[in-house]
Amino acid sequence: GTDLPLCAEGRAQLEELKAKFQYPDVPLVFCSPMLRAQQTAEVLFPNAKLTILQDLREMNFGKFENRPITELVKDPEFAQWMDPTSRTNPDGAEDRKAFYDRTNVMLMKLFEYQLRTHTEEAACITHGGVIMNMMANHVLPQHKPEEWMTDPGCGYSLRLDAEMWMRDHIAEAFDIVPYGYLDGAEE
């Protein structure tokens, strides 16, 4: 995907979230190599060790990069590519199955690293498509990928039980990050 920096508006939104709500105090942040993800990590977790992982990058949209979603939803070729039953792969775009496999393997590696090193808390800064895919495939409660969509600067706290992970490759989502973000919000 296109490696754009965090825009001034995005940085201001993150600063506002950090001022209003609580982010967990974690020693380690796994992060996408994309510049905007690294800059997000610097704002939200300035004291954490940053570990850049290539497989946390967003899907490469190829010829659809940098086009507004309002335009893309009207494009029949984009709709066909997004259809889960389609094997269409537009020019320059990452194959959806390759993306699915890459992000699922990455989550497994992250969790196995945490279990092996006894890392009790860590954050992961990545992108919407990566989050939705990982959560839909390895997290309870089960939801469709689009139901795991988060607002910018937000995410989920997961509970990783070693036995459940080793047996089922499943973790449990138990809260929204930042803490307090949904308090008083209508569901």
How does the language model describe each region?
Residues L4-P5, L44-R102:
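Phosphate-handling substructures
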